[in-house]
């Protein structure tokens, strides 16, 4: 009889543990990040994106990187880098900085710049920007690398 009671008690504890784990997983998955035009709205200190597909890279381009990070109160740091598979005649990184407009549920461009270089396989560009607090910001880049015009 004692074994039977211990067996039932052990089974009950195991069942309660399984139910508790399941409840924890359900509540954790409820924190979905909102995605707007391919970008997740997050409060992380830093976010980095890379070229997503080998098809987008072409013959010369190996990798493209875009990074945004907090750089103090009311400041962000925007960074873009382009890497080629080999030395190319022309390379450029076009960096766009956008702010999320919650009222219209869309991104609006607040800054952009172009960095160019020749006869290289790597380049990067960065800028620190003063921004208004209370908004979401993102950085995205166009990466160009080639040997013949048009690139």
PLM regions: where:
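Short, surface-exposed binding/anchoring microloops in extracellular/periplasmic proteins
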Residues: 57-97
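N-terminal prepro-regions of secreted/extracellular proteins
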Residues: 1-69
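Short acidic/polar inter-strand loop motif in beta-rich domains
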Residues: 143-151
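Solvent-exposed strand-loop boundary residues in beta-sheet-rich modules
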Residues: 101-103, 147
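Hydrophobic/tyrosine-rich beta-strand signature of extracellular beta-sandwich/beta-rich modules
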Residues: 139-141
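Solvent-exposed serine/threonine-rich low-complexity stretches and specific carbohydrate-binding patches
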Residues: 95, 106-120
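Exposed aromatic-hydrophobic patches
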Residues: 121-131
């Amino acid at each position: 009889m004692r074994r039977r009671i211990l067996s039932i008690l052990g089974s009950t504890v195991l069942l309660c543990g399984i139910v508790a784990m399941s409840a924890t997983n359900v509540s954790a998955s409820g924190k979905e990040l909102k995605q707007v035009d391919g970008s997740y709205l997050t409060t992380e200190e830093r976010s980095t994106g890379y070229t997503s597909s080998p098809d987008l890279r072409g013959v010369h381009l190996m990798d493209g990187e875009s990074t945004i990070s907090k750089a103090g109160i009311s400041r962000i740091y925007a960074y873009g880098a382009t890497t080629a598979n080999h030395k190319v005649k022309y390379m450029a990184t076009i960096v766009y900085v956008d702010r999320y407009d919650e009222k219209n549920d869309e991104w609006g461009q607040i800054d952009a710049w172009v960095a160019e270089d020749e006869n290289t396989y790597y380049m990067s560009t960065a800028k620190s920007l003063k921004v208004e607090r209370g908004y979401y910001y993102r950085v995205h880049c166009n990466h160009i690398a080639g040997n013949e015009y048009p690139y």
